[in-house]
């Protein structure tokens, strides 16, 4: 049994070698000749999986170690009776913490308290739901927009995108990319609703590049529209607009979900799915794979102020560390993917044990994802 895995899937060799021969390969471009004798293919979001890649190949199972799967032609796989699995929610925590890191940058630069702002979340699935929960735990006003969930009658108060555009100080997008149908999210932000968006708003996209019409956004910024913009995803990738890159406040190379924990969850989820497929069920405890972080414990005193929160968040991950490298090399062919391939280890807040002398501080930190204790 031969299993082909993306070389950027941590722990894939360690896990899949128990099942057969494992070969790690680049995801873009994927060496198509390797598929001639491959039984299972494990990819990440940079690999387009469709008839062009797999027609006539012996592959019987495709797994993507990512939450989204718009890079996979699932309808074609189903027609060919090729089993498929994704990793829903695997990097949700990482994306939430990316958004918080960016918000702490703006809060410091502009001198605002997050609790004085209204955050509009578009797409309230694994990422958006977790983001809303953490923001609310801190006392931040949140407006939610999720038409599919609203239509299902889910037990939440949902608002229209137009309401969020008008009322939210911060807009962050966590919707899947749908290019057709009732819940079309292609160019959800476009020229017409950029006109509606008041000046001074913060716009964050860490979902899919095409959710925002990048040409329309660039045009608005060139015309003097005053917006603070964070883009982790681009239209197109990897050949993003250098002009737009130079206009946005924070720019990163599609790495919002790239924590070690998030990647490891993706690997373990598709590993477990493949084990089920071949009739050898397994369960992997993430803690058995992850190393101890470089900074594992810190002590804090007093109440949880925004200043303290910002220090803790940026101790674990400061989004600006990923902005500068992209700006340096974005115009060089292949460098966007290299930044992703050789991405430095990044951990989640839960990897940091925070020892607090204030029980309320410990409780709040635990509520938003830190590993806090009161002593």
From Swiss-Prot:
Q: Where does substrate bind?
A: 45, 66, 258
Output a single Gene Ontology CC term carried by this record.
Answer: cytosol
Would the keyword Transmembrane helix be found if you checked this record's keyword annotation?
A: no
Compartments, as annotated in UniProt:
Cytoplasm
Which GO molecular function terms does the record list? 4-phosphoerythronate dehydrogenase activity; NAD binding; protein dimerization activity
Per UniProt, where does NAD(+) bind?
Answer: 146, 175, 206-208, 232, 257
List, in alphabetical order, the GO biological process terms annotated in this UniProt record: 'de novo' pyridoxal 5'-phosphate biosynthetic process; pyridoxine biosynthetic process
**Which residues are catalytic?**
208, 237, 254 (proton donor)
Q: Which UniProt keywords apply?
A: Cytoplasm, NAD, Oxidoreductase, Pyridoxine biosynthesis
Grouped into one coarse class, the protein's main location is cytoplasm
Task: Please indicate which superkingdom the organism of origin belongs to.
Answer: Bacteria
Question: Known HAMAP family for this protein?
Answer: PdxB
> Tell me, what does this protein do in biology?
Catalyzes the oxidation of erythronate-4-phosphate to 3-hydroxy-2-oxo-4-phosphonooxybutanoate.
Its assembly, as annotated, is: Homodimer.
Family indicated by similarity: Belongs to the D-isomer specific 2-hydroxyacid dehydrogenase family. PdxB subfamily.
UniProt name for this protein: Erythronate-4-phosphate dehydrogenase
Q: Which organism is it from?
A: Proteus mirabilis (strain HI4320)
